């Protein structure tokens, strides 16, 4: 039971339009409140400061996504002037969802600032994977090719690949099917050395029957491609086989 014939592009279009509409209609109020919430004292992990930061971040998200270059600049400034990791990471996450020239520069600057911290690097991996901008797959593949990324490290895979396959609802469901093909490529690669690790990358594609016909067929084709590959593990074969069998019984 649930939604069927889901069109992720249509959902995203409506969501973005609503966000832009609110961001523009409430622009001046948002800007005033954003400035009012600027912290004057030292950073504290208190409930009061946490609530203020959360509201400030939500306002910044609406402003940065309303289409005004000045507000993208505000997001860049937010990251650059951050005196704590929370502000910097949230700002980077907001900017990562905007297709603009500053995005890649700030992503690289953040990496260079924090690359020596393994835990922060994991968070950066997630931001890269979840970024819903055109070319997201190329960005993930680029990180996978770098010496600082280790596919054998579960935490690396969980954050970078999990960010894309589990949380990037836009580019994973790109209407050209590239996200589904990428998933099949990665599953087949991982299956060679960690046969039990692929299932956590698959929650979106396991819901393939609920999507609109074009995406449904593209996802099914990649599931069939995996199932027909010689030498895959019994676990992956069973997982994919069950998904395909359920569709035939439905």
Tell where the protein language model's regions lie, with residue ranges:
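Long, ordered, helix-rich scaffold segments
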Residues: 1-250
């Amino acid at each position: 039971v649930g939604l069927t014939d889901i069109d992720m592009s249509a959902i995203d279009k409506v969501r973005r339009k609503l966000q832009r509409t609110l961001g523009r209609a409430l622009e001046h109020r948002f800007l005033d409140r954003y400035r009012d919430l600027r912290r004057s004292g030292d950073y504290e992990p208190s409930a009061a400061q946490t609530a203020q930061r959360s509201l400030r971040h939500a306002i910044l998200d609406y402003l940065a996504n309303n289409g005004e270059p000045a507000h993208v600049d505000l997001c860049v400034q937010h990251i650059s002037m951050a005196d704590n990791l929370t502000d910097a990471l949230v700002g980077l996450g907001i900017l990562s969802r905007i297709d603009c020239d500053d995005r890649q520069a700030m992503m690289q600057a953040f990496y260079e600032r924090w690359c020596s911290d393994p835990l922060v690097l994991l968070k950066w991996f997630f931001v890269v994977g979840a970024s819903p901008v055109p070319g997201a797959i190329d960005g993930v593949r680029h990180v996978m090719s770098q010496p600082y990324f280790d596919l054998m490290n579960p935490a690396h895979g969980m954050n970078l690949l999990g960010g894309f396959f589990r949380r990037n609802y836009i580019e994973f469901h790109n209407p050209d099917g590239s996200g589904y093909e990428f998933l099949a490529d990665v599953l087949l690669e991982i299956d060679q050395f960690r046969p039990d690790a692929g299932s956590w990358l698959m929650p979106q594609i396991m819901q393939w029957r609920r999507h609109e016909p074009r995406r449904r067929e593209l996802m099914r084709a990649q599931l069939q491609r995996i199932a027909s590959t010689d030498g895959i593990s019994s676990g992956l074969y069973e997982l994919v086989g069950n998904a395909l069998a359920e569709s035939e019984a439905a």
